[in-house]
Amino acid sequence: MTGLDEALTRIRFTDTGLVPAIVQQWYTRDVLMMGWMDAEAFRRTMTEGRVTFWSRSRQEYWRKGDSSGNIQFVRGVALDCDGDTLLVTVDQVGAACHTGTYTCFDADPLAPVLGERPESAADGW
């Protein structure tokens, strides 16, 4: 069994065969975006040096930057403690978001609503 085969056995894909992949700039640790991968997208990401995703809407593989030039070069891939989410660290060239912003999380931040939590909530809620 290769290292890639072993890694694939550790990933807990959804019932539809997908796993969320959080993309993070390797040197700033900024979270850039989230995309979906299936086993083939994971294999391509691990062997080609560029991040490949599976588009749920278009039902096809895509790589960030193929049309925009905003390429994501893979620096590392980690699996979370539950085995159901990937963290892909990249060297991002240009904007990560399809809107042209550096990160997909630059938009309207949501304010916490701590004053509205239930009385029965623990302090750690």
Curated annotation (Swiss-Prot):
Cofactor names from the entry are: Mg(2+); Zn(2+)
Q: Say where the protein is mainly found.
A: cytoplasm
Any one Gene Ontology cellular component term annotated for this protein:
cytoplasm
Q: What EC number(s) are associated with this protein in UniProt? A: 3.5.4.19
What is one process in the GO biological process aspect for this record? L-histidine biosynthetic process
**Which residues does the annotation say bind Mg(2+)?**
D80, D82, D84
Keyword Translocase among UniProt keywords: no
Complex formation: Homodimer.
State the similarity comment: Belongs to the PRA-CH family.
Q: What is this protein called?
A: Phosphoribosyl-AMP cyclohydrolase
Annotated source species:
Leifsonia xyli subsp. xyli (strain CTCB07)
Gene it is expressed from: hisI
